[in-house]
Amino acid sequence: MCAGTRGGDDLVQITISGHPGSGTSTLVHLLCDRRGWRSLNGGDVFRAEAAGRGLPLEEFSRLCRDEPEVDRALDDRLRLEMQAESGPEVIESRLAGWWAHQLGLDCIKLWLEVSPAERSRRILEREGGELSAALERMNERMAADALRYDLLYSISLADMSPYNLQMNTDSMQPDEVADAVEAALESQGD
């Protein structure tokens, strides 16, 4: 069941999820450029809220951990956008596929899988620094996020049941990933 339509199109065409460094943001930019779609990035919502409160990301993450209602309010905002008639066609966040699944949205729910070594390499390329430090930060963030998702929603990121498309992109270039996703969108009859 779709939440609704806009000009005959489903509101949300695709949710894109994956661990940090998996290429979700790159894919979103490519799809939006190719199709003229709009997107909403859960990380951007998180960063904007942190900035609005005058807090660095690490401190805002602690606030979300200590005050779960703050984190829930951000996720509620994403869920509302997913159902809004004027909402974007692409939603990017680690839990977007879960929200679409729970809301019964008829869209592609994509999970990008990438090995820890490749994610670390990509993060290092993007942010610079030392590989060991990048790995440590990535592992700490993933552990903290996994705990938070479990405590808030009883969701395990290891559970892929909400996702109707999973892609391992270790050896794929960004355009190859976008081409494969566009083929999936076409086969679904976007």
Where are these regions (language model features)?
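Small-molecule kinase domains that catalyze NTP-dependent phosphoryl transfer to phosphate-bearing small molecules
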Residues: 98, 131-180
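Hydrophobic anchor at the beta1->P-loop junction of P-loop NTPases
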Residues: 16
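Hydrophobic positions on the alpha1 helix immediately C-terminal to the Walker A/P-loop
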Residues: 27
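Conserved phosphate-donor/acceptor-positioning beta-strand/loop module used by diverse small-molecule
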Residues: 105-127, 136-139
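P-loop (Walker A) phosphate-binding loop of NTP-binding proteins
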Residues: 19
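Conserved glycine(s) of the Walker
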Residues: 23
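ATP-dependent small-molecule kinase phosphotransfer cores
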Residues: 42-102, 116-118, 128-133, 143-145
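Post-Walker A helix-loop "phosphate-sensing" segment adjacent to the P-loop in P-loop NTPases
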Residues: 33-40
